[in-house]
Amino acid sequence: MPVALCTMSHSPLMGRNDPAQTVIDDVDAAFENARTFIADFAPDLIVIFAPDHYNGVYYDLMPPFCIGAAAQSVGDYGTESGPLNVDRDAAYTVAREVLASGVDVAFSERMHVDHGFAQALQLLVGSITAVPTVPIFINSVAEPLGPVSRVRLLGEAVGRAAANLDKRVLFVGSGGLSHDPPVPQFATAPTEVKEKLIDGRNPTEAERNAREQRVIDAGRDFAAGVATIAPLNPEWDRNLLDVLTSGEIEQIDSWTNEWFVEQAGHSSHEVRTWIAAYAAMSAAGKYRVTSTFYREIPEWIAGFGISTAVAVDE
């Protein structure tokens, strides 16, 4: 059955700390193009790779990868809350085949997800329930992280599994590109923050609002040039997009985790979701990128990208 791809950056600052209207118009046009692409493809199933930002997955048990057979959106930053429309049978099929391929992946019957999943689904298909979904969490913030080669192997295994589902499958990757938002690092965090990173579930409304306001303030400071976080790196972003477009994803295997941080900020690891999605596409054979959008948007603390791709019949 046919497969297709849409990868996108997300930002909780969209609508809260916006750039110039011309930039918003460009982003809106790119998303409209992506929505049209997806509507024309008419997926039966979305397999979405996304990170978490200490809203659903914590250091009390931090897997590198996790497939959800059921998932609940926590509704942070005003995103839609409630259960995702998860295709449980498909999730089990994908998990079995990924494990059989030698990639160790965790499995959840009660996954909690945040804006990394919810914002992508809302922007691309209208809601978190519009299309049956298999959510796949990829740890992209909580060190230690495995090598990026394992992410590619995960994606390839998911792609092979999807080929056996007898469904039109859209692979979505949500995250990145270069960015360094104020996400605490466990090794250097104060004790009280470490406790929140270990198990910060069910925050009060006041706690969540305060946390979100810190990120909004950081975005405003970053856009004003007074923040201490790492700068965006458009050159790095475009190089990544070029590699993914080329189909030679194995090039990324040599990129070390330290190099990601040095070049593109701590949260550049979120591009693991793009790598997994493109690797899943590659499992079906050659692919062709049909659109690529990129803008450097400091107000959203993001090198912001959107891409779409289809399989090439050989």
UniProtKB/Swiss-Prot annotation:
* Catalysed transformations (reactions): 3-(2,3-dihydroxyphenyl)propanoate + O2 = (2Z,4E)-2-hydroxy-6-oxonona-2,4-dienedioate + H(+); (2E)-3-(2,3-dihydroxyphenyl)prop-2-enoate + O2 = (2Z,4E,7E)-2-hydroxy-6-oxonona-2,4,7-trienedioate + H(+)
The pathway it acts in is: Aromatic compound metabolism; 3-phenylpropanoate degradation
Q: Which UniProt keywords apply?
A: Aromatic hydrocarbons catabolism, Dioxygenase, Iron, Oxidoreductase
Q: Which GO terms describe its biological process?
A: 3-phenylpropionate catabolic process
Protein's UniProt keywords contain Oxidoreductase: yes
Q: If you read the UniProt record, what top EC class would you report for this enzyme, in one word? A: oxidoreductase
* Keyword Ribonucleoprotein attributed: no
EC identifiers of the protein: 1.13.11.16
Q: Give one GO term, molecular function aspect.
A: 3-carboxyethylcatechol 2,3-dioxygenase activity
Per its UniProt record, the required cofactor names are: Fe(2+)
Pfam families attached here?
Answer: LigB
- Active site as annotated: H115, H179
Q: Which Gene3D superfamilies does this one have? A: LigB-like (3.40.830.10)
Record text on subunit structure and interactions: Homotetramer.
Report the protein's function: Catalyzes the non-heme iron(II)-dependent oxidative cleavage of 2,3-dihydroxyphenylpropionic acid and 2,3-dihydroxicinnamic acid into 2-hydroxy-6-ketononadienedioate and 2-hydroxy-6-ketononatrienedioate, respectively.
Q: What is this protein's name? A: 2,3-dihydroxyphenylpropionate/2,3-dihydroxicinnamic acid 1,2-dioxygenase
- What gene name is given for the protein in this entry? mhpB
